[in-house]
């Protein structure tokens, strides 16, 4: 997986004219997940529609275990109503990867969205998660990333995260910036993450 080829492919997609007035331009690409066997890249893209400008990122990686397997998902385009078939991660693998990231990065994790995702998945998708599959997904994710942690250490780490002022400040900034997270207190978020941990051990 070469960075130059990835950027070239995304630039080709960005340059495709959909006759909708929206343009996309690749800004840059940086290395991510260097601790993984294959690593990955984060590509920043600028989207423009008349006077509206929006920057977003695309994370690209390979080699991650997906347990039990990828899922088929039909995405409905908000603008045209077109239904697009996609291959997506299982819920169990999404949760496992985010849990491992939160635990391994600890208070240094600057992505408040990781915390929010684990919270909202607990609140809205718990009935769709198979706990046995989740345990296997977490095990394989940790093995792939050469990471291990005991339950009591994970809970202790989450206590440290919950009480860290910098983490709480970043969370406050995030909830003010992102409408859907407005009003969600960090204590409730960490409480739900601990529930995921209790499910795993």
Q: Where are the model-predicted features located?
A:
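Structured mid-to-C-terminal alpha-helical surface segments
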Residues: 1-201
């Amino acid at each position: 997986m070469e960075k130059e080829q990835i950027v070239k492919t995304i630039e080709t997609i960005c340059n495709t004219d959909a006759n909708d007035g929206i343009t996309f331009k690749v800004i840059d690409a940086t290395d991510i997940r260097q601790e993984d066997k294959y690593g990955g890249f984060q590509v920043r893209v600028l989207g423009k529609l008349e006077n509206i400008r929006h920057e977003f990122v695309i994370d690209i990686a390979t080699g991650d275990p997906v347990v039990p397997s990828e899922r088929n998902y039909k995405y409905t385009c908000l603008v045209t109503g077109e239904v697009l078939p996609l291959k997506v991660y299982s819920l169990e693998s999404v949760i496992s990867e985010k849990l491992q990231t939160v635990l391994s990065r600890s208070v240094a994790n600057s992505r408040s969205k990781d915390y929010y995702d684990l919270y909202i998945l607990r609140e809205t998708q718990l009935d769709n998660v198979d706990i046995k599959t989740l345990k296997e997904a977490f095990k394989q994710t940790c093995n792939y990333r050469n990471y291990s942690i005991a339950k009591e250490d994970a809970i202790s780490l989450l206590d440290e995260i919950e009480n860290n002022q910098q983490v709480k400040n970043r969370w406050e900034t995030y909830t003010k910036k992102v409408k859907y997270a407005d009003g969600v207190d960090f204590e409730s978020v960490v409480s739900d993450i601990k529930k995921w941990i209790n499910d795993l051990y």
